[in-house]
Structures are given as structure tokens and as C-alpha cells.
Amino acid sequence: MGEALRRSTRIAISKRMLEEEESKLAPISTPEVPKKKIKTGPKHNANQAVVQEANRSSDVNELEIGDPIPDLSLLNEDNDSISLKKITENNRVVVFFVYPRASTPGCTRQACGFRDNYQELKKYAAVFGLSADSVTSQKKFQSKQNLPYHLLSDPKREFIGLLGAKKTPLSGSIRSHFIFVDGKLKFKRVKISPEVSVNDAKKEVLEVAEKFKEE
């Protein structure tokens, strides 16, 4: 009987040791990390739509020297629709100067520079100011500064984008000027100061005028 008791004791100890070993080898359970919810709703969808629109607009090829003016129409300060193609059909030389925002200091210097040189420029070219400002802002700007030329409103920056004068895909315009001769882009000046824009545009217009005399 003593031998049987010792045998059962050894079996019980071995069984307990085996259970302890198995518990050591058992995989450690980790708490489940909750999945991050993706935000949805009108605001999220609206932001996504803006980004998608910006990406589409940034894919548009910029006009290069020699390219024809696009067939677009923009509103001027009087809310009249102006066809860009008709402008170039009626004028051999057309100057478009782009300014970031109406009635700001740098843009006022640029616009007034073209105003002060307008009498000479208009002998050879048509001059247009261009920005993403509203029609109302353009009218106030024109009236306050006595600007003798039209200001075109391009709130979606369609023409501004084609000219390569967008500051970012989402907003902003870069100060610049562009000169079309016989409907095609001849001069392209981007990221320049107000004074350089006026002076260079004047030189370029006079240069074209001299070539016309040789024809």
C-alpha cells in the first residue's frame, strides 16, 4: 500500500509540472486595438471635392510661347462677358497683367503703372488687368484708381491657370504679365515686381511695334 501511495504521489507531481510547462508555452493574448474610424459627412466630402478639383486643374497644360489664346470668356468690371479670342481678333497686340488681389499695395502700384503708361501703350496694344477678384472688387479698384482699361474677373482661375500664374492649386495668383501677338503668346513674365512688370511690358510692346513697321 505504501508503494502504491508513493506512485500516485509521483504521478500527481508530474501532472502538475506538465500543466505548468504548458501554461508557459501558451500564447499571450493581446487586447484588440479598436480600428480608427474614417471621417465622413458633408464637410469631409466637400474638402475632398476641393482637393480633387485642384488636382484636375493642376493637370492642365500651361500655355507656352507660340500657343494660341484659349477660347474662354470672362466678366469685366461692368459684368460684361468678354471673349478672349475676340480680343485678339480685334487687336494684334494684347497685354494681360495678372495681380494677386485688387486694392492691395503692390497690385495698386502695378495697375497704376499701366495706367500712367496707358496713353503710349494703347497706340500699339490693348491692355487688360486680370485677377481672381470678384466683379464688384474689380469695379471698385478701377473707379478708385481711375484705371482706363478693363479688369477681368477670373474667380476660378481658369485663364490664370493656363497662363501658369497660379500661386497654389487651391488659391492665389502670381504677379505677372503676358503679351499675345496675332492671337499667340509672345512674352511670358511670371513672378516679377510691379515696376518690372510695367517697364518690361512697355519695352516688349514697343519692340513688337518696331517689327510691325518693318513688315
UniProtKB/Swiss-Prot annotation:
Origin: domain of life: Eukaryota
Record bears the keyword Oxidoreductase: yes
Record GO cellular component, one term: nucleus
A GO molecular function held by the record: thioredoxin peroxidase activity
Stretches the record annotates as Disordered: 20-59
Main location class: nucleus
Domain Thioredoxin: 63-211
Pfam families the UniProt entry points to: AhpC-TSA
Positions of the catalytic residues: 107 (cysteine sulfenic acid (-soh) intermediate)
Activity dependence on pH, as recorded: Optimum pH is 6.5.
Record-linked PROSITE patterns: THIOREDOXIN_2
Enzyme class at the top of the EC tree: oxidoreductase
UniProt keyword annotation of Transcription regulation present: yes
Additional facts recorded: The active site is a conserved redox-active cysteine residue, the peroxidatic cysteine (C(P)), which makes the nucleophilic attack on the peroxide substrate. The peroxide oxidizes the C(P)-SH to cysteine sulfenic acid (C(P)-SOH), which then reacts with another cysteine residue, the resolving cysteine (C(R)), to form a disulfide bridge. The disulfide is subsequently reduced by an appropriate electron donor to complete the catalytic cycle. In this atypical 2-Cys peroxiredoxin, C(R) is present in the same subunit to form an intramolecular disulfide.
Function recorded in the entry: Thiol-specific peroxidase that catalyzes the reduction of hydrogen peroxide and organic hydroperoxides to water and alcohols, respectively. Plays a role in cell protection against oxidative stress by detoxifying peroxides and as sensor of hydrogen peroxide-mediated signaling events. Has a role in telomere silencing, which is the repression of chromatin structure which leads to a stop in the transcription of nearby genes. Also has a role in the regulation of telomere length. Acts as an alkyl-hydroperoxide reductase in the nucleus during post-diauxic growth.
Subunit details: Monomer.
Name by which UniProt lists this protein: Peroxiredoxin DOT5
Species per Swiss-Prot/TrEMBL record: Saccharomyces cerevisiae (strain ATCC 204508 / S288c) (Baker's yeast)
Gene giving rise to this polypeptide: DOT5
